[in-house]
Amino acid sequence: MAARIYIGRLTSRVSEKDIEHFFRGYGQIRDVLLKNGFGFVEFDDKRDAEDAVHDLNGKELGGERVILDYSKPRGGGGDRGGFGGGGRGGARVSSYSGGGGGGRDRFDRYDRGPPRRESRYGRPYSTRHRVVVENLSSRISWQDLKDQVRRQGVEPTYAEAHKRPNEALLCFATPSDLKRCIEKCDGMDLNGRKIKMIDDSQAGRSRSRSNSRSRSRSRSRDRRRSRSRSSSRSKSRSRSPPKRSRRESKSKSRSRSRSRSADNRKSRSPSRSPKKVDRSPSPPRGSRSPSEKGSPRRSRSASPMDNGDGDN
């Protein structure tokens, strides 16, 4: 079923070749219609149009970020008839005129931001039901591979190609879709090569389980180590006396030095006091001492023999 896309914010420099190059890899394009400031692109498959809107909306084209939206014919007009674009709330956009002028003024509401309409199939998402595609030609893109799988009646939820040379990855919503894809597409000839499909869901599960087990083991080991370290630290802390802060040690050392200096002063003070008494000025040589004052002094004149005076 064909589908048409509206392109807003187109510059005058963009040509049909630029449009075809912009949408390359998103399926077959039927028609390109360019207007002044906007345009339309018609795809053969509606799903290709939805993928293009989802992936390319807001991308740069000709130096401007273009706006992509779905367009539906209103009332069966032709290429020049009116089309309406639907937002999430079902709001209608004014009809696209087939004339040339004033296109940018009519669609100023698109300048507020990209449309919020989601794809019918939802956004691409990866699942654990995965298929690895080998021997894929380098000329086959992920979109081409996805289209081939769709033609077999299976809808992939996610596709990527050539992250590894000649390999691709497909994801599916259910295991039954995965099996159907392998049954119908394994050995298919694409561009001269027979592709090989391998179920990768079991490998992914085993890897995730082994990773989770190894992580849990490593975590338990780390916890044991941390517990042993904490216990040893607590024991060493309890055995060793508590450390004193620098301030306390400094203050205590100062108080000890002060007390020592005070003791030294006290011990020195009694030894110095008698010395002070000894240092007192001695009496002059001519003066008598107190002991001599009390005792009578003998003089040579007092003795009778020395004086020579007698009774004679």
Curated annotation (Swiss-Prot):
<keyword id="KW-0694">RNA-binding</keyword>
<keyword id="KW-0744">Spermatogenesis</keyword>
<dbReference type="InterPro" id="IPR035979">
    <property type="entry name" value="RBD_domain_sf"/>
</dbReference>
<dbReference type="InterPro" id="IPR000504">
    <property type="entry name" value="RRM_dom"/>
</dbReference>
<comment type="similarity">
    <text>Belongs to the splicing factor SR family.</text>
</comment>
<feature type="compositionally biased region" description="Basic and acidic residues">
    <location>
        <begin position="103"/>
        <end position="121"/>
    </location>
</feature>
<dbReference type="Pfam" id="PF00076">
    <property type="entry name" value="RRM_1"/>
</dbReference>
<dbReference type="GO" id="GO:0030154">
    <property type="term" value="P:cell differentiation"/>
</dbReference>
<feature type="region of interest" description="Disordered">
    <location>
        <begin position="196"/>
        <end position="312"/>
    </location>
</feature>
<dbReference type="GO" id="GO:0008406">
    <property type="term" value="P:gonad development"/>
</dbReference>
<dbReference type="GO" id="GO:0008380">
    <property type="term" value="P:RNA splicing"/>
</dbReference>
<keyword id="KW-0507">mRNA processing</keyword>
<feature type="compositionally biased region" description="Gly residues">
    <location>
        <begin position="74"/>
        <end position="90"/>
    </location>
</feature>
<feature type="domain" description="RRM 1">
    <location>
        <begin position="3"/>
        <end position="73"/>
    </location>
</feature>
<dbReference type="GO" id="GO:0040009">
    <property type="term" value="P:regulation of growth rate"/>
</dbReference>
<keyword id="KW-0217">Developmental protein</keyword>
<dbReference type="GO" id="GO:0003723">
    <property type="term" value="F:RNA binding"/>
</dbReference>
<dbReference type="GO" id="GO:0007283">
    <property type="term" value="P:spermatogenesis"/>
</dbReference>
<dbReference type="InterPro" id="IPR012677">
    <property type="entry name" value="Nucleotide-bd_a/b_plait_sf"/>
</dbReference>
<dbReference type="GO" id="GO:0005634">
    <property type="term" value="C:nucleus"/>
</dbReference>
<feature type="domain" description="RRM 2">
    <location>
        <begin position="129"/>
        <end position="202"/>
    </location>
</feature>
<feature type="compositionally biased region" description="Basic residues">
    <location>
        <begin position="206"/>
        <end position="259"/>
    </location>
</feature>
<keyword id="KW-0597">Phosphoprotein</keyword>
<protein>
    <recommendedName>
        <fullName>Probable splicing factor, arginine/serine-rich 1</fullName>
    </recommendedName>
</protein>
<feature type="region of interest" description="Disordered">
    <location>
        <begin position="69"/>
        <end position="125"/>
    </location>
</feature>
<keyword id="KW-0221">Differentiation</keyword>
<keyword id="KW-0539">Nucleus</keyword>
<keyword id="KW-0508">mRNA splicing</keyword>
<keyword id="KW-0341">Growth regulation</keyword>
<keyword id="KW-0677">Repeat</keyword>
<dbReference type="GO" id="GO:0000398">
    <property type="term" value="P:mRNA splicing, via spliceosome"/>
</dbReference>
<comment type="function">
    <text>Plays a functionally redundant role in spermatogenesis and growth rate control.</text>
</comment>
